[in-house]
Amino acid sequence: MRPSAISADVLFEEFRSSLRWEWVAGLGASERRFDEMAVRSARSGADLVGYLNYIHPYRLQVLGEREIAYLSNATPQDCQRRVARIVTLEPPVLVLADGQTAPEALLSMCERAHIPMFSTREQSAFVIDVLRAYLAKHFADRTTMHGVFMDILGMGVLITGESGLGKSELGLELVTRGNGLVADDAVDLYRINQTTIEGKCPELLQNLLEVRGIGLLDIRAIFGETAVRRKMRLKLIVHLVRKETMEREYERLPAEPLTQDVLGVPVRKVVIQVVAGRNIAVLVEAAVRNAILQLRGIDTYQEFVQRHRRAMERGDTF
């Protein structure tokens, strides 16, 4: 799922301070938006912004020093024709960067065609980088999953499982062990590129953890600023199951690593059985450490299989 296209006035207000831009033309087109077909067909929101280019319609066009020179340094007829061609691109917004002054023909065209134009003294490359990062996030595929999302040993870990298995209590214990809370109960997940999922907490639930019998806890107020995180990249899913589910649906030693599809991206997954007396927090941290080793190319299970094969070839007995 992707959100609806963003309007010119929302984009302007979002970066009014950071890009220090002014609205210099097309003031009556504040509701102008990105083309919906262009948004759906774009591989990423980053594809929706770039330097002035006549073969890429429907995207936010940035005009720096070279682009303004191209529009200005020609015969009056050629300059008029080059400016007029911009209308055929149907840009949602034009951004004048590098402290350039817009040619009168460009200003007039924006007013006639109802195209918003912003002006900033920031470098054009910087403007493009900022807008690409913002649009990539804004138009990213997204979903919401139930669970506790945490920073455990520097890795983004989503703890999932049936209701009543103690996910929030586990999250609280992990916080006391020096880890950080991102979100409890509802986790907003975004695919920010082809291989990366980023998660954060809905604003309404920020810093909150619900523990049955106690109620809502403000983790930031109780444990301090370092006990919470604003966002993390999802690298591991820890799924809690009951004993009967573990015995019925999962192998004790799976031959291949488990993964779960999240927004089209396979995410590593481990399954932990919840029974009385087990220290689940220690098991979760051990699973995270093992996942870190696997990311570094160290697979304990495969090393054991190779060790076992060599022993069999030597004829060793066990």
UniProtKB/Swiss-Prot annotation:
Residues involved in Mg(2+) binding: S168, E210
Keywords associated with the record: ATP-binding, Kinase, Magnesium, Metal-binding, Multifunctional enzyme, Nucleotide-binding, Serine/threonine-protein kinase, Transferase
Region annotation Important for the catalytic mechanism of both phosphorylation and dephosphorylation: where it falls in the sequence: 209-218
Region of interest (Important for the catalytic mechanism of dephosphorylation), ranges: 273-278
Binding site for ATP: G161, E162, S163, G164, L165, G166, K167, S168
Essential cofactor(s): Mg(2+)
Entries under InterPro entries matching the protein: HPr(Ser)_kin/Pase, Hpr_kin/Pase_C, Hpr_kin/Pase_Hpr_N, P-loop_NTPase, Ser_kin/Pase_Hpr-like_N_sf
EC id: 2.7.11.-, 2.7.4.-
Residues annotated as the enzyme's active site: H146, K167, D185, R252
Reaction(s) this enzyme catalyzes, per UniProt: [HPr protein]-L-serine + ATP = [HPr protein]-O-phospho-L-serine + ADP + H(+); [HPr protein]-O-phospho-L-serine + phosphate + H(+) = [HPr protein]-L-serine + diphosphate
UniProt GO MF annotations: ATP binding; magnesium ion binding; phosphorelay sensor kinase activity; protein serine/threonine kinase activity; protein serine/threonine/tyrosine kinase activity
Pfam family of the protein (one): Hpr_kinase_N
GO biological process, one term: regulation of carbohydrate metabolic process
Main function: Catalyzes the ATP- as well as the pyrophosphate-dependent phosphorylation of a specific serine residue in HPr, a phosphocarrier protein of the phosphoenolpyruvate-dependent sugar phosphotransferase system (PTS). HprK/P also catalyzes the pyrophosphate-producing, inorganic phosphate-dependent dephosphorylation (phosphorolysis) of seryl-phosphorylated HPr (P-Ser-HPr).
PANTHER family: HPR KINASE_PHOSPHORYLASE, PROTEIN YJDM-RELATED
Subunit structure: Homohexamer.
Family of this protein: Belongs to the HPrK/P family.
Additional note from the record: Both phosphorylation and phosphorolysis are carried out by the same active site and suggest a common mechanism for both reactions.
Record comment regarding domains: The Walker A ATP-binding motif also binds Pi and PPi.
Name of the molecule in the record: HPr kinase/phosphorylase
